Amino acid sequence: MTWICLSCMLWPEDLEAPKTHHFKVKTFKKVKPCGICRQVITREGCTCKVCSFSCHRKCQAKVAAPCIPPSSHELVPVNTETAPKNVVDTGEAASRGGNTRKSLEEDSSTRVTPSVQPHPQPIRNMSTSRTTEDSCELDLVYVTERIIAVSFPSTANEENFRSNLREVAQMLKSKHGGNYLLFNLSERRPDITKLHAKVLEFGWPDLHTPALEKICSVCKAMDTWLNADPHNVVVLHNKGNRGRIGVVIAAYMHYSNISASADQALDRFAMKRFYEDKIVPIGQPSQRRYVHYFSGLLSGSIKMNNKPLFLHHVIMHGIPNFESKGGCRPFLRIYQAMQPVYTSGIYNVQGDSQTSICITIEPGLLLKGDILLKCYHKKFRSPARDVIFRVQFHTCAIHDLGVVFGKEDLDDAFKDDRFPEYGKVEFVFSYGPEKIQGMEHLENGPSVSVDYNTSDPLIRWDSYDNFNGHRDDGMEEVVGHTQGPLDGSLYAKVKKKDSLHGSTGAVNATRPVLSATPNHVEHTLSVSSDSGNSTASTKTDKTDEPAPGPASAPAALSPEEKRELDRLLSGFGLEREKQGAMYHPQHLRSRPVGGPAAPSSGRHIVPAQVHVNGGALASERETDILDDELPNQDGHSVGSMGTLSSLDGVTNTSEGGYPEALSPLTNGLDKPYPMEPMVNGGGYPYESASRAVSAQAGHTAPMRPSYSTQEGLAGYQREGPHPAWPQSATTSHYGHDPNGMFRSQSFPETEPQLPPAPARGGSSREAVQRGLNSWQQQQQQQQQQQQPRPPPRQQERVHLESLGLSRPSPQPLAEPPMSGLPEFPRAASQQEIEQSIEALNMLMLDLEPATAGAPLHKSQSVPGAWPGASPLSSQPFSGSSCQSHPLTQSRSGYIPSGHSLGTPEPAPRAPLESVPTGRPYSPYDYQPCPTGPNQSYHPKSPATSSSSSFLPTTQSSVGPQQPPASLPGLTTQPQLPPKEVTSDPSRTPEEEPLNLEGLVAHRVAAYNARLQGTGRRVSSWHPPLHRLRSSSLSGVQAREKQPAEPPAPLRKRAASDGQYENQSPEPTSPRSPGVRSPVQCVSPELALTIALNPGGRPKEPHLHSYKEAFEEMEGTSPTSPPPSGVRSPPGLAKTPLSALGLKPHNPADILLHPTGEEDERKVLTELSEEPRSYVESVVRTAVAGPRTQEPEPKSFSAPGAQAYGHETPLRIGTLGGSFVSPSPLSTSSPILSADSTSVGSFPSGESSDQGARTPTQPLLDSGFRSGSLGQPSPLAQRNYQSSSPLPTAGSSYSSPDYSLQQFSSPEGQARSQFSVAGVHTVPGSPQARHRTVGTNTPPSPGFGRRAVNPSLAAPSSPSLSHRQVMGPLGTGFHGNTGSSPQSSAATTPGSPSLGRHPGAHQVSNLHGNVVTAPGSPSLGRHPGAHQGTLASNLHSNAVASPGSPSLGRHLGGSGSVVPGSPSLDRHVPYGGYSTPEDRRPTLSRQSSASGYQAPSTPSFPVSPAYYPGLSSPATSPSPDSAAFRQGSPTPALPEKRRMSMGDRAGSLPNYATVNGKVSSSPVASGMSSPSGGSTVSFSHTLPDFSKYSMPDNSPETRAKVKFVQDTSKYWYKPEISREQAIALLKDQEPGAFIIRDSHSFRGAYGLAMKVSSPPPTIMQQNKKGDMTHELVRHFLIETGPRGVKLKGCPNEPNFGSLSALVYQHSIIPLALPCKLVIPNRDPTDESKDSSGPANSTSDLLKQGAACNVLFVNSVDMESLTGPQAISKAISETLAADPTPAATIVHFKVSAQGITLTDNQRKLFFRRHYPLNTVTFCDLDPQERKWTKTEGGAPAKLFGFVARKQGSATDNACHLFAELDPNQPASAIVSFVSKVMLSAGQKR
């Protein structure tokens, strides 16, 4: 037994010889606890000059501890024998010194003398004598007084490790009580969460670096916790190489330096010494690189590069000697956000250190975010591979197209003698996928051979999937406790077991290298792909072999869950078993029992049996490119680009080894950990370990594929709440809204998990939010799904119990804190990656540590979370509501997912009530809440007052007002039963006060509070809108609601709007006394700065291809910066961070009003907007997350809707006012409101004044993201939101008159009635809300693109409205908002369904059908569209019965409209032009689940008449006709018509006026592929709505808007292809242009313009041939946080919308060759006039043709070609065992050749066969048929023969089977043979 001094933590050498202390009186500047009474020494106290022991002067006499000079201890030999630690640090033997023994001292050899440092501060005796690498002991070091590093060597054996863990836990509890928060930086372990009350999971693979945004999240979380309470300490736990701790310490050192204060200088110095002394020698180059990135981004020395980079070549200068005879057999694996995106062939290189080898990637591989490139050596004739080198970097810090890493910069290689001393690796990038000219010299010589057989499991095996596999830690032993601090004695007795020193756990040693289960995580859908869709391609790598289940019987998935999983996964090509893993966080988190993964450098032997992708990988080289359109990346992401990017490093077994086969067994843990998506895919369960479902809670952990790491935070309270946390009873529902939390969670989130702390995951922001929500949601859902839904509180309890934790009886406000802090899920989708990058920027922005004044402010921790404070909920979540439950309040309506849609959720009533109106003091709550409860959200409050009057009834009063029944639009639902009202208390999961005790959670909570508060304030009634942040936010789509789970109103950010629409307004909760003003996290200055720098989010949601994807997925628009309560560190706002893309906030989003209503407004805005900071997002998410679960019906309660009336006065223009003439508006104009007329879309002269708005003025835009169509201004939102928290939701028409009336704002500013885009509830449908665009200017084309939400409005449930479940459609699964996967959105007659994309989300539902009963106008933003959105491949049919106008933004989609029902395009009702996007029948960007929407190329002509000589008039080759002919999505731009009834001055202008397209027919062909090949025909005219009688105040009637002529319909052609654009422009005058949606970069736009002469380089290259095509130049318009800009043109500003960009360039060319000439007529009309019938092959070829087919196989033919090759290939394929699995691919034929795109990335991303390589194409000569696995008639087989890349003689035959009956194989073959090949021959 050993004694340890609790005060100084030193181990006395001789307890028997006490020495007298030498006390001196000292005034303590820093808070320090008394060593005797443990109370804080506030002013004067005594401190010993020798040992630094401190106490109160009055306690001095009680001191009994001997004075032990530190020096004596430094000399004390470490008693290694007593140290049970045999833990071997992976590669680094981190442990040192005896157990908890202050090995600190050892480490702190530099220990500061007492004179300098009164406290035992980091006794850093970095004694070099003890090499950390060899130490096998626990190493506990006080890096600073409040930061403790606990490290164990990876080799420590489990028994010793567990023993040490217990001892450390005892020591921490005895010394710090409950004031420590443990950050687990290594894989998750159940025992850690059992031993420690508060744990945040930020783990990542050992020896790797975390995602940049994860670093931000950790710093933010640490700062929040440390600032929350002077007693709080942070414990960094790591098992493995201490480099992980070093990264965090160094990053926090830089982070804290931003707002540095003199009193912290010593701490920073201590951190610096610790890092330099202990970490640098053992760290990895990439870890140092990331610390440098982080430091540079914070300081501004590194500018954020948001451009996507395409990697073309990886050149190794110097050949490593891995073979006995020299040379090596390298192959590359490239991971984006820890998701594999590319695997090269295996190069066989013989050479020496002077030789170079180039690995070429064609086409270029798109990389964005956190990138990991590993080069392996495949051993010759051995199933093993060695790591040659590994390098991690982040594209945001790459500014050169050539990057060189020397040996010292390469992980693994830097200390490997086999790698040449002067060797280096060079990366060659470009800004496009096209081959780089002039790089031919990089070709390898003939001696280098390449084997493209990447299907070998060894090659495919990824080593990051089991990083967090569930492990059984066997913590059955009781912690050998003590007597000690617990019994008041000064010393704690720690029982120590003798352990064999140095015995390393056999774990690693024995761990079979060959785990039966290869890690597949990498292959899981890569959540991180840009597209936000997980890339199945990444999956390709994964093996199907299931991993053994965990020992604990995993709970089996319920049939419903299985179905849901299957449905969701079906698009990914993943089997459920793989998914299974995802479900279980335990698995994910637990590591193989075997122990830590072996160092990645280890050799991996891959089981041969693993088959990739079901085998049948084409031998041909695959390019696994994560395209922006990766299809469903749900698997998690996120971390947006980095989300996944951050993938929280899941290295499960380090690369070195496979996860132990045991891993599954490992966890017996009863408490499932929140599922963290694996680092890689995070969520996708790989067969291996993940797969097991946690038996424990009996719930399956919901799969959160995209869960970003940070999301995990949400899982923070993984364990039961601990008493400390104040939590309202309702907490139980922690954000179960799957949507809210999980991206694509279609699975029930059965596993209870604590809300993760704000760890920022894929998209940190999102992740955080998700995290918070996720835990809540998961818990709730799990409970709900698994059990009858008990009341929320009860559910919560149940959850906890299921976890094995019993929760103290609910206390309304103070729940015990959950033991777990938020943890974040692991994977991120591409989107997430993007988001994460964006988030990263935001994060960095947000990172600014809070200034001393408001320690919490910085992150604005969750208000109420602190025990003393009212629960989070009580604080306004975003400060918005003062009410006791900020979280709950806001969306009180939230219904646990379990409830059926219509069922009200039992809401625990009281928490809210229990809390006094004024919220209790909460550290986080900086802003006092308004005094009166009512104050909370009154439309009338001054800020809002302007609009308040608008409402007929001033329900605004906080009272439990009933929704004004009178409001026509609001048909309020019958008042919700009290419980619903009360539901308020039952916080939506998001609202649930997370039991995040202090900590980030608080911050999060605060944000949530702010968000929620506002929402709440709006009306607690409203069911929490699900803040779907785009449901598929980072790649994760909000998980679709399970059938069982009621769709909750989503608060989604309109896909295009970039803001969340409340899917349904939440009824105001009577209780929500008033929402208090939101806590302001951001100082007004910062807010202003942010406002001025909307860089945070693309103003036009679609604009940013990558970011957009994330954002779309997130569905969040930037929210206003945290309210002023917190000041950002000085200068931070000015730092480039904002430039970093730290999700700067759209100024418009930021409500600067500091006061009451204004605050509320802010809150509302914030709610609707995307959180600006990750914390905020977390908060928001927390707030919103739960909402998600609420049934949408709940949201119906119109009360909120009524609020609509209070539109915020719009500064911008009068509603009716004519459109402000567009003046070039630079994006910089902070206020461009998304929709605000001139603001966002077009520059407007008035817009400038917006910029000037005073903080008090609500930014009109705040409600809108620039470009966001529907968001009402915050005021408006707030007003109407009073009824609904989300701005949009609230906008339901509350007043009879839809037009926003102008109210003079209290400020006295008269706001012109700007039509605020708001969600209007159509009269009669309480819930449905239509988001109208208030701006006069056409929104940027992108607006409509975002997610579609299904709107299910049961007759009774007004609120259904559409939940925009799916984030961007592309993202992967489209979540169903409907309760059923296929939820069809049906609105009963009379209840208009105003879904933004009702249909869309329908699409998102798989095959959702939207049916509108006759008479019920469906105002879906894209009702049909998403329906029509072929994109989703799902075939959703939207049928509007006659009589029911369907106002879908893209009604036409694929859905068919019954003849009688007018289909109003997006906002048809409002008259005006539809935005270009609106006009697009299908959401171009929404592309289907596959995530990739191919260019809208015409289908293959079936009739011979199409071919030369027989051209049919109908099919004129003109690009225009071609597009339309095929029914391709090319938008038919109807003439703009004004509704006859639309001439009302008050009407809200809607861009979309009557541009609506009616889809006259459903997709004709089965090609509903995202590629857009589907044939959808749209009528070009809109029905005259005037014929349909609609209430006078209906949106249609109000639709009169006068715009300056909108020419966008002439120049914005979203669906045309590049070739069509060229054809349209080649005969035009210079300056003519067309903007289309980029088909290569999702979310970006292509500008094609005619110039007078081609560039000189082109002239030289093409001296012969037709130069007319070269006169049409192409530019990429990329979207970013600040809007849109020309890519690659540094002197180009950012513009708030495409319109702004176009008008500016029509005035001055800037970087363009000449000015743009704005057309006054449609070029397609001209081309039709000028072009005769196409009868030449060249015309047809220019047009191209495409459709979807089944790719069967590719067979090597050597030199064989012709029909014999086709026949032979088919024979071999059919005879193969097993028969290859067919994959749907997009088959496009053009003048360039044949391009195959695997929309789901199952086999490859895209393959192109140039025209000159294709030699033959024909049907099977033997007429054999292909039997489809899914059934159906046998399909004809056909194929083409093409020369293999790089060979002049060898051919390969590529076989296909017809898929679409309307596109028979014969038509395809005819086109290829008669058109393409014949054209090639003529040349």
From Swiss-Prot:
InterPro entries: C1-like_sf (IPR046349), C2_domain_sf (IPR035892), PE/DAG-bd (IPR002219), PH-like_dom_sf (IPR011993), Prot-tyrosine_phosphatase-like (IPR029021), PTB (IPR013625), PTB/PI_dom (IPR006020), SH2 (IPR000980). Its EC number is 3.1.3.-. Residues 129-301 form the Phosphatase tensin-type domain. Residues 1611-1720 form the SH2 domain. It is an enzyme of class 3 (hydrolase). One of its GO terms (cellular component) is cell surface. This is Tensin-1. The gene is TNS1.
